[in-house]
Amino acid sequence: MLEIRGLSPSLCLLSLLLVLHGAERSQPPPRRRFEYKLSFKGPRLAVPGAGIPFWSHHGDAILGLEEVRLVPSMKNRSGAVWSNISVSFPSWEVEMQMRVTGPGRRGAQGVAMWYTKDRAQVGSVVEELASWDGIGIYFDSSTSDVQDSPVIRVLASDGHDLQEQSGDGNVRELGSCHRDFRNRPFPFRARVTYWRQRLRVSLSGGLTPKDPEEVCVDVEPLFLAPGGFFGVSAATGTLAADDHDVLSFLTFSLREPGPEETPQPFMEKDQLLLARKLEELKARLALGTREASIPPLNPKAQEEGERFFNLEDTLGRQSQILQALQALSRQMAQAEKHWKQQLGSTVQVRPEGGWNTAKVSTLLYGQRTLIQALQEMREAAARMASGAHVFYLPVGTKHHFFELDHILSLLQKDLRGLVKKTAKAPRPSGWLLGSSTCLHTSIFLFFLLLQTVGFFCYVNFSRQELDKRLQEYLSTGSLSLEPALPITRTIGVLRRQPISPSMQA
């Protein structure tokens, strides 16, 4: 039998740690549930005029559609957002994305994420945490040492401390790590998980969109009672100022892993729904309600049936009207014939005492008026009968083609009449159809050239006459009694004439 002696304590401790780590990794992860009332993210992060749903903002915080700017890049500013609803579950996980940008290597006071018993309003100064009952993850960028800045610290106040409480009542630092979260090309992500009295803070660098997370602080055992509030705050100092933006704050409740609920197939859900409806129908039939027993008619089919019955009623009424109008027309014809017979008999029979002229004329006028009215009524009845008969005929019969033929013949007659009127209209001699009344270009240029030649001939002739008169004036010294020459033209001619010897003397 092989016997092992001299096993060192360090090896035993290492093996124990490996066993514990393997057992921890073998445990299934907790079940997560998204809590929308404790979360916010873009786009449309804030409702215009109403703020963030289920959250309140304080101080210099500026709400946008994509992010919450806790503090702008101005000195001595502070702002915060706090949840209006408390945390009702014992274990939770928060995923936060933020961006801190500003000039220089040294930043402002930084950003702090809180889980406290009571809600505060503004500020991220560490000294104020002593009066709070909670913890805070403090992203500090105000350290004077550039090499050690920025730093992430996990702080706790009275009531939420380690089980081995020191009793001094001051702020305790549970852990810290150095990560540069200022001026990153992508948002800086932080994951805070509280599960089974263990707090873990994991960070991503923000150099790429999917940087791997690294554990910054892992503290246990730590007891955090439910009923607290989440908050995020930031502040700037007197020396430097950064823009502090929170892009998203997502909260998840954690529960013990259990047997997964197998979702029912879609067909089973349909069967259950149909079975429930069948039971409801049976219950209604048992009560004897007629409305439930008679299935409702299809509204579209019902509308079509009503339309069909209405059409039949209309056609029946129109046929009755047609028959009544035809009978009325026959009665009118008989009445007209009877009145004509009576009128002829009254003309032939003459009383012994003679006719009264006024009475006879009045009687004849009344008879003519009555006959005319009867004729008009007969024509109106005939028109109504023909209209009703046409309406009664079904669509697609030959009478439509007869009507179209009649309309086309009328249009042809109108067009022929217009053509005849146009042909009979008087036209000037030499008029051609389609000829234009505008002047041709060649004729216009010919007259323009003729006018130009005449103008130049007139100017040349006038100039020769003027030169001739001036020569006579210079030779004789006397000017004929002609109309006075224009002074400007005379001076121009004199300038062009040479000086004679007599004028020089």
UniProtKB/Swiss-Prot annotation:
Topological domains annotated Lumenal: 26-438
Localization per record: Endoplasmic reticulum-Golgi intermediate compartment membrane
Highest taxon listed in the record's lineage: Eukaryota
Alphabetical keyword list: Disulfide bond, Glycoprotein, Lectin, Membrane, Signal, Transmembrane, Transmembrane helix
CDD domains the record matches: lectin_ERGIC-53_ERGL (cd06902)
Domain L-type lectin-like intervals: 32-254
Protein name in UniProt: Protein ERGIC-53-like
